[in-house]
Amino acid sequence: MGQYFKVHPVNPQLRLLNRAAEMVRAGGVVVYPTDSSYAFGWHMGDKAALERVRQLRGIERDHDFTLACRDLSDIATYARVENWAYRLLKALTPGPYTFVLRATHQLPKRLQDPKRRSIGIRVPDHTIAQALLGVLGEPLMSSTLLLPREQFPLTDPEDIRDRLERQVDLVIDGGSCGMDPTSVLDLSGDEVVVLRKGKGDVSAFES
């Protein structure tokens, strides 16, 4: 039976987030709120947790996941960022964007796109997500909480608990959350390519 923490959306309780971080380090799968939707989170070095999320979401092995980072310094560790891309990242983070970047050798190959050797990275603009990343002290692998046969992510934390309490280790209740996906911008080449229009404004990058 998974645990259920009610975390204050403005002043998150540090003791609860410390326990959440301990679960992640121990190989747990947690559900946490972001600025776009609720998401699964797990330690980037844990293969078993990765497989659990694949099964929960009903997705194939070639599905790309996202690395949730606290700030730009984390991004620079796991992705190669050109100067022009860095300026864009600085302007758009934190926020509802996922950026596709070329991965560095610090990132395990199983987490990279097998063909392009890239990774999707985001910096969530959400108090609880930021606090969790701060306590954890490293990025968190992340995937939208979209279940098989569902058209939209789950948004109500009590509904999430009722449906997943036997399948995840923790649900962090940060209140009702949105269901809009992030906008995805590919920065792995020489210019910005919009891969998905979502919550973040992409009008500046469309011709």
Ranges and model annotations:
Residues 1-207:
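Active-site-adjacent structural elements in enzyme catalytic cores
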